[in-house]
C-alpha cells in the first residue's frame, strides 16, 4: 500500500507540484521506510520508487496512517481499525446513551474473531503484527495493550509483564503505546455473549 501510495504521490507531484516543505522531508534525501526491511523480503522495485521521488518529489507528505477509530467505527459498525474488538457483542456508554455493537458478519465469522481480552493473555503477538505494519506506515501507531488482573496472582498484573510489553513494543518498532486497558473477568461474559452460538444483546 505504501509503495503504490508514494508512487501515485510522485505522479501527482509531477502534475501539480511538490507538497510544501518537501525539501525538509527524509524522502527528499532518498530515505524510504522500506530501507529497514531486509532485501530478500522486498517484492517491489523500491529503487525505482526512490528515483521517482528524487525526480518529481511527493505531492503528499503522508500517504499511509492508521487513526484510532474507536468512535468512528461505531457509526459504520466496523471493528476499531487495527485493534481486536472488545467482544463479539459489546456496549459503550457516551453522552447520548449506551450503544450496543455486534461485530460485522458475526454469524459467519464467529470463530474468526480474536477479542482484545484473548490477546490480553500475551500482547506480544499483537505487538509483533503492529510492528510489521509500522514498517510501512507514515505516522506512529498508537497501540493499546490489554490485561485481565483476575488472571494473575492477587488479581494484580505484575509490573514485569507491563514492562515486558512496553519494551517489546519498542523492540518491534512501535514508537508509542496509548492505553493499557484492564478488565475483570465479570465483564468478559457480557462483552462476548456468543458462547452458545447465538449472540445475546
Segments from the language model and where they lie:
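Conserved A3 ("GATE") glycine/threonine-rich loop of ANL adenylate-forming enzymes
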Residues: 1, 36, 69
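Extended, well-ordered alpha-helical scaffold/bundle regions in very large, multi-domain proteins
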Residues: 1-33
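Catalytic alpha/beta core of large soluble enzyme barrels
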Residues: 14, 18, 39-43, 52-59, ...
Amino acid at each position: 500500500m505504501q509503495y503504490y501510495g508514494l508512487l501515485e504521490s510522485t505522479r501527482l507531484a509531477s502534475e501539480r507540484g511538490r507538497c510544501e516543505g518537501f525539501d525538509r522531508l527524509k524522502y527528499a534525501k532518498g530515505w524510504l521506510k522500506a530501507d529497514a526491511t531486509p532485501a530478500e523480503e522486498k517484492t517491489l522495485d523500491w529503487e525505482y520508487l526512490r528515483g521517482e521521488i528524487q525526480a518529481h518529489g511527493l505531492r503528499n507528505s503522508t500517504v499511509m496512517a492508521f487513526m484510532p477509530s474507536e468512535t468512528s467505527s461505531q457509526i459504520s459498525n466496523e471493528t476499531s481499525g487495527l485493534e481486536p474488538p472488545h467482544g463479539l457483542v459489546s456496549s459503550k456508554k457516551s453522552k447520548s446513551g449506551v450503544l450496543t455493537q455486534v461485530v460485522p458478519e458475526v454469524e459467519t465469522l464467529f470463530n474468526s474473531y480474536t477479542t482484545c481480552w484473548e490477546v490480553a493473555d500475551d500482547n506480544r503477538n499483537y505487538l509483533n503484527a503492529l510492528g510489521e505494519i509500522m514498517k510501512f506506515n507514515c505516522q506512529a501507531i498508537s497501540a493499546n495493550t490489554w490485561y485481565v488482573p483476575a488472571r494473575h496472582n492477587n488479581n494484580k498484573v505484575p509490573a514485569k509483564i507491563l514492562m515486558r510489553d512496553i519494551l517489546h513494543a519498542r523492540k518491534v518498532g512501535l514508537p508509542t503505546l496509548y492505553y493499557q486497558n484492564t478488565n475483570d473477568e465479570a465483564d468478559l461474559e457480557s462483552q462476548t455473549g456468543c458462547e452458545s452460538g447465538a449472540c445475546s444483546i
